């Protein structure tokens, strides 16, 4: 059992997925090109790698019980049954107690990868039963270098995006590649600086809500389209092919 710790932007969830991909792939992630297994793990479609995440304040006890049941199953196609729990610090003590035995004595075929902002955010009973990996937030220069090497943005744009994102790679990439996001951010800063009356704050809040709704809808559509494209690529389906019932 492993506990991967790092503040927002450090890539702890991506680290967990990459680790899982290396464990499951026949080449252990050493090939120049990613294997099919690696692609499936990173895309979230591998049958033996399960990710527990939540957008709620806490992770429910029923969710943990369900994933424990999954952990007890033998892997179907790979060497390991891997369970990734994002934001394990969101578990209440009662929920954590349900998980303790599995973490302390996992099944021979199962590996647990837990993620949290820091080891101090996790109950001592979890910390003492895991191997801890601490990640650091990348520097502004490192993030800017990543953006220029993986996107088509100019160095000046990459540098500004990295500085504003304060080391958070995901946010920096969004700033660098989506002009509307950067424009909305600049508009917000100017709006706050120009607030003079309570009515100004109300108008600004209304604009922020409208922009957030539009951005959320656009992001959801983009993510859905990307996931479908990746799913089709992994399963050898052309964009115009119908998805067979067995793959749905």
Kindly label every feature range from the protein language model.
Residues 1-94:
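Clamp-loader machinery-focused feature within the broader ASCE/P-loop NTPase space
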Residues 58, 90, 105, 121, ...:
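Residues immediately C-terminal
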